[in-house]
């Protein structure tokens, strides 16, 4: 493999060796970006790490319909999602999260304002007193190494670690092949068999089963737009 590809592989190995779960936090307010969630899920899939999507701020009425729709879509394509209220129901939220994070090293990611810090403080109350600064390469292409903080919960009432990524906002996925993308997007891949051409990229080709599924309402239009944004940069055709 090329040097760049080798570097990506090493980053993937490093991440997989240290992290057991990727936790993606979002909330109805401030306005969340579904593409951030989807990019994080794709990155976790590519790294071979299980992912848990955490919908926070469930107590908010504003934007609740959009957040609930996002949860339904994620669940419909097989993703693991839980809904919590770190501020409204802190004890219940903590118990539910500990149940999922027990015994694991969990990476916490999310857009600014989604309540990630509140969740971190619920999980590791002594977080500010016991931090270890380090850099973690999120195996997502160029310029993705970010400062991260590792918090051990062994002194509390549960065993595990939480890795926070303050200020981390973007996942670069330019290194992914079309096969990588399709493997991580089963809702798109399910319709590939209907394509007229074996090397269809599901972009502008005639007789595309994926585009037909979008037109028939069988594939979410926003998901297809997300797929297109990645596929135009993909470096290989499907096998």
What is each PLM-predicted segment?
Residues 28-31, 57-62, 87-91, 157, ...:
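Conserved nucleotide-binding/hydrolysis micro-motifs of P-loop NTPases
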Residues 60-112:
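Canonical P-loop GTPase G-domain recognition
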Residues 4, 18, 102-103:
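Alpha-helix C-terminal capping/helix-to-coil transition sites in glycosyltransferase folds
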Residues 177-182, 223, 228-229, 239:
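Conserved P-loop NTPase catalytic core
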Residues 1-5, 9:
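Single conserved hydrophobic/aromatic residue that forms the stacking wall/gate
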Residues 11-80, 188, 205-234:
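Conserved C-terminal guanine-recognition region of P-loop GTPase G domains, centered on the G4
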Residues 95-186, 190-199, 204, 233:
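Conserved G1/Walker A P-loop phosphate-binding module
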């Amino acid at each position: 493999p090329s040097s760049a590809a080798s570097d990506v592989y090493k980053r993937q190995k490093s991440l997989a060796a240290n992290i057991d779960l990727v936790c993606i936090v979002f909330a109805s307010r401030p306005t969340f970006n579904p593409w951030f969630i989807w990019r994080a899920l794709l990155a976790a899939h590519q790294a071979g790490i299980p992912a848990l999507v955490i919908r926070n701020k469930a107590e908010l009425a504003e934007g609740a319909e959009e957040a609930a729709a996002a949860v339904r879509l994620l669940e419909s394509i097989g993703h693991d999602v839980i809904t919590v209220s770190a501020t409204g129901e802190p004890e219940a939220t903590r118990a539910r999260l500990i149940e999922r994070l027990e015994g694991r090293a969990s990476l916490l990611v999310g857009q600014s304002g989604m309540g990630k810090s509140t969740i971190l403080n619920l999980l590791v109350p002594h977080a500010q007193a016991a931090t270890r600064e380090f850099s973690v390469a999120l195996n997502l292409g160029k310029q993705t190494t970010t400062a991260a903080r590792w918090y051990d919960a062994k002194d509390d009432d549960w065993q595990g670690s939480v890795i926070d990524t303050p200020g981390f906002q973007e996942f670069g996925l330019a290194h992914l092949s079309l096969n990588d993308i399709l493997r991580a997007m089963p809702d798109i891949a399910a319709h590939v068999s209907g394509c007229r051409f074996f090397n269809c990229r599901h972009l502008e080709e005639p007789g595309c089963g994926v585009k037909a599924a979008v037109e028939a309402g069988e594939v979410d239009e926003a998901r297809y737009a997300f797929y297109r944004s990645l596929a135009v940069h993909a470096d290989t055709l499907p096998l």
